[in-house]
């Protein structure tokens, strides 16, 4: 009978590492927490970026509106400048001094018209104030009439009050303002703009005609204005 001997060396049992169930569960929990943390961080980051984007857009929008407002103001200033330059050029084209140098009658009529306009402006302003306070304007009219007569203005006396024959608005203002209004009608929409350009027209006209009074017995427009203003102040100061 044959005896069989088995060698233990050929039948070794390999030891296998077995991870406990509890340890695997812990790893899954940690992984889930890590994923959740990343997700939360991403959401927070997205929220911050969104807030920054909105803030930037608001700032950009505000800056755009501010820039547009500034640009609008600049355009208004430039347009006013253009209108005034046009008025000045129109006045130069009238060539008041040139025409006056060629025609003594024209020069005399121009001086009378300018001083008569100064008379009318001062008279209207003071009379309006005196009447509003219930003051009799007859003495005032008599005194400024005498001042106008002394200045060399032609006119007529009625009810003991002298009135210049050329009393009225400055004859050069209307054509100057009208030409600018026709050229730039959008700049004469409101009364404030109209008044502003009228004041400017009067200013440049007075500067233009000033040389006509250099060699003349008549007072300059500025001197005549001061004479009438002093008379007006005397009556205004006595009002209650």
From Swiss-Prot:
Asked if the keyword Secreted belongs to this entry, the reply reads: yes
GO molecular function term, any single one: GTPase activator activity
Q: Could you tell me the Gene Ontology terms of the biological process aspect for this record?
A: actin cytoskeleton organization
Q: Which Gene3D superfamilies match?
A: SopE-like, GEF domain
Relate the outcome reported for changing residue 182 to C.
In strain: SARC9 / s3015
Cellular component GO terms, alphabetically?
A: extracellular region
Which InterPro entries does the protein's record reference?
SopE, SopE-like_GEF_dom_sf, SopE_GEF_dom, SopE_N_dom
Q: Where is this region: GEF catalytic domain?
A: 78-240
Does the keyword field hold Secreted? yes
Any extra detail in the entry? Encoded within a lambda-like prophage region with similarity to GIFSY phages.
Q: What protein name does the entry list? A: Guanine nucleotide exchange factor SopE
Q: Which organism is it from?
A: Salmonella houtenae
């Amino acid at each position: 009978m044959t005896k069989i001997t088995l060698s233990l060396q050929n039948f070794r049992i390999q030891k296998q590492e077995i991870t406990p169930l509890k340890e695997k569960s812990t790893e899954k929990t940690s992984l889930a927490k890590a994923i959740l943390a990343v997700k939360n961080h991403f959401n927070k980051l997205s929220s911050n970026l969104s807030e920054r984007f909105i803030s930037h857009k608001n700032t950009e929008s505000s800056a755009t509106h501010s820039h547009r407002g500034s640009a609008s103001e600049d355009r208004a200033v430039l347009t006013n400048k253009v209108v005034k330059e046009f008025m000045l050029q129109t006045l130069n084209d009238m060539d008041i001094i040139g025409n006056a140098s060629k025609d003594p009658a024209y020069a005399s009529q121009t001086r009378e018209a300018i001083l008569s306009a100064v008379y009318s402006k001062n008279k209207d302003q003071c009379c309006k104030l005196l009447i509003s306070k219930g003051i009799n304007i007859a003495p005032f009219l008599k005194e400024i009439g005498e001042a106008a007569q002394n200045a060399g203005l032609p006119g007529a006396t009625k009810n003991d009050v002298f009135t210049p024959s050329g009393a009225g608005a400055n004859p050069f203002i209307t054509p100057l303002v009208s030409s600018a209004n026709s050229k730039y009608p959008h700049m004469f929409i409101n009364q404030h703009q109209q008044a502003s350009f009228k004041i400017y027209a009067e200013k440049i006209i007075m500067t233009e005609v000033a040389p006509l009074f250099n060699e003349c017995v008549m007072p300059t427009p500025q001197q005549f204005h001061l004479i009438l203003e002093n008379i007006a102040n005397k009556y205004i100061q006595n009002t209650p």
